[in-house]
């Protein structure tokens, strides 16, 4: 019997995705090998990589001004990766501090440049998303964590700023439509919404790169991975394949509009019961901060 999983960690995957992923472990693409055994330089995997990127672009309506990357290291690696690639020591990044993940990103960013915490809900144990704050001019970018699984909060209004947004969307990527033009970088570990742990989706606006003065290690330079088509080093083949299957499923369900409606309906069922039943007590004090995820 399949369990219902309310964990803040890796989420369940559609049954059809699990079945196809299981078949590929035994033999992939009629090639006599498991997908766990094929070369990342093979035509079979090149086709997987191309389709996965194509689906990401189609579902999220991503233009060619953005690169789509499939990287290792998890979203936590992106906490410093983004700063290394975007922020010079004398420049400042703005942050919304809305939970443990944003706090970790702030810590890592301070290694490479200045940080301006625009607003924080830390003193109230992150039980809401801050609303009344100003974003000064001159920031290199503004970093947000779009959804906070631990605290049950989600950004429903993006910061008003001329600076590009950098967003950790690990736990709500492709759960709703977003104004992509506001974002310079979006990154997300796959295990919440897109597949198993092991691959991180990164969407980066290419014109933002190449502006830092520091020398970057090849493995930590977005431009190297863009040039290498996410194969500069051996990519996480199987997680990317399962991501492809999950993206196919999202497309079949009706894309982001359908996902958004489904999540709104699901969240309403839960919150209605929490509000109605005296045995439950919600931890998010501001209803507008409640997560749909």
Describe the role of every protein-language-model region.
Residues 14, 190-271, 285:
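Active-site C-terminal subdomain of aminotransferase-like
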Residues 9, 109, 120-173:
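Active-site phosphate-binding strand-loop segment of PLP-dependent enzymes
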Residues 2-53:
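A glycine-/small-polar-enriched, mobile loop at the entrance of the PLP active site in fold-type I
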């Amino acid at each position: 019997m399949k369990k219902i999983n309310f964990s803040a960690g890796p989420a369940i995957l559609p049954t059809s995705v699990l079945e196809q992923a299981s078949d590929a472990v035994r033999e992939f693409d009629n090639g006599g090998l498991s997908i766990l055994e094929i070369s990342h330089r093979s035509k079979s995997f090149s086709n997987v990589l191309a389709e996965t990127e194509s689906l990401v672009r189609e579902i999220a309506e991503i233009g060619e001004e953005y690169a789509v990357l499939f990287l290792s290291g998890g979203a936590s690696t992106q906490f410093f990766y983004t700063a290394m690639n975007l922020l010079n020591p004398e420049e400042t990044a703005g942050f919304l501090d809305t939970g443990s993940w944003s706090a970790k990103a702030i810590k890592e960013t301070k290694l490479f440049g200045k940080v301006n915490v625009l607003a924080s809900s830390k003193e109230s144990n992150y039980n809401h998303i801050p609303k009344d704050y100003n974003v000064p001019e001159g920031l290199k970018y503004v970093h947000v964590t779009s959804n906070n699984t631990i605290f049950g909060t989600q950004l429903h209004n993006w910061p008003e700023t001329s600076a590009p947004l950098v967003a950790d969307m690990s736990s709500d990527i492709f759960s709703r439509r977003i104004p992509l033009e506001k974002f310079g970088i979006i990154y997300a570990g796959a295990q919440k919404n897109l597949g198993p742990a092991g691959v991180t989706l990164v969407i980066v606006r290419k014109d933002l790169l190449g502006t830092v003065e520091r020398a970057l290690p090849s493995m930590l330079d977005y431009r190297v991975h863009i040039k290498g088509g996410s194969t500069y080093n051996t990519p996480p083949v199987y997680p990317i394949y399962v991501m492809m299957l999950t993206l196919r499923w999202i497309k079949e369900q009706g894309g982001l509009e359908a996902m958004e409606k489904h999540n709104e309906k699901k969240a309403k069922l839960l919150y209605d019961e929490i509000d109605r039943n005296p045995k439950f007590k919600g931890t998010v004090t501001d209803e507008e901060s409640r997560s749909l995820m």
